[in-house]
């Protein structure tokens, strides 16, 4: 009986470590956080500088965050808006229960990028994420303050 208990604990430990590694290895949005983007964000948030941030990011869209999830467009006005197109299969992967829905995707994939981009910004905009299906119909939205998301 102790052998089975030990094997079970070992299996749980391996699964936990592999899931952690997968989360860290799959932070592809951070590839968009270039020195030119950091420089543009560090400037005062005038309309012109916000457009520059938009252009720097939108020239690289559509950008695959992971299989089935693509960053389609970024808009930076009063808030930092990200439009992500997601396949049903990928949405189902993240929607393990009804209450959390796609918050896990936003927490794992969007927050690290958002926090690193605006870490040195003089003004930190709120984050708005709109996840749309393949036809462009919104099925999940998230709105968060920098101070609540990035610590």
Model-derived segments and their meaning:
Residues 2-11:
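Bacterial N-terminal signal peptides that target proteins for export
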Residues 47-51, 100:
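Generic alpha-helical secondary structure signal
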Residues 21-25:
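Sec/Tat signal peptide C-region and signal peptidase I cleavage site
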Residues 26-42, 50-93, 119-151:
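Polar/charged, Gly/Pro-rich intrinsically disordered segments
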Residues 10-18:
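Bacterial N-terminal signal peptides
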Residues 92-122:
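Short, non-transmembrane amphipathic alpha-helical segments
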